[in-house]
Amino acid sequence: GSGNIIAGNAVLIRNFVQDIGQAHIMDVGIKAALGYNPRSTVDWKGNRPSTRMGAVAILRENFIKARKLQKLLETEKKVIDEVDPLTDLFMDILSNRLKMMVHVHKEDDIMVLLQLIKEFGIKVIANHCVDVHREEVFTALKASSVPVIYGPMDSFPYKVELKHESWRNAEQLLNSGAKFSIMSDHPVILQR
């Protein structure tokens, strides 16, 4: 989940079906995370950042590698069989075949996310954003065509990056005109 910088596929499903094969509606994108979570899970395997900048650096490295490989494939200096699965995934994100569903709370992390969008031309959906307390940040997301899946509303501010979390922040989102939906994040987060 959100402890990984790149966590896996995000899909849209039907919750109540007779046959689990009917549950899958469509692939939505790839789950990614910025901020506190990826740097807080130090016991997990793989390349782990110890700072927010470190998490962004790992994302950028993967995008740069994928962009270089795309160019080599276009010039036939590489064949698709030589591409590892993670780089192939990042090439799908770069070509906008997949969106990134990014776990992000803080305004500064959102600004970094907007820079990644500008640098690599990727499509993103911002998940959470509950620490955003200024309308300008939601307006910047709207200007970059980033929809928001907002929430959970009125959850306990259980980590430092949620110090501005308030159900009142939803007004800033609404006033910005950004596209959004509301999430419960159930059963991960207890509500007040």
Identify the residue ranges that each predicted region occupies:
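Short secondary-structure capping/turn micro-motifs that flank functional sites
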Residues: G3-I6, H133-R134, P157-Y158, I189-Q191
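Active-site-proximal beta-strand/loop segments in catalytic clefts of secreted hydrolases
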Residues: G1, H103-H105, H128-V130, G151-M153, ...
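Short, surface-exposed, polar/charged, turn-prone segments marking secondary-structure boundaries
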Residues: A23-M26, T41-V42, C129-D131, M153-S155, ...
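Short, surface-exposed linear patches
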Residues: V17-I20, I122-A126, P147-Y150, A170-L173
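His/Asp/Glu-enriched, well-ordered alpha-helical/loop segment
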Residues: K99, T139-R192
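Long, well-ordered mid-to-C-terminal structural blocks that present hydrophobic/aromatic surfaces
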Residues: E119, I125-H128, V132-R134, F138, ...
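Polyanionic/metal-chelating signatures
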Residues: G1-V124, H133
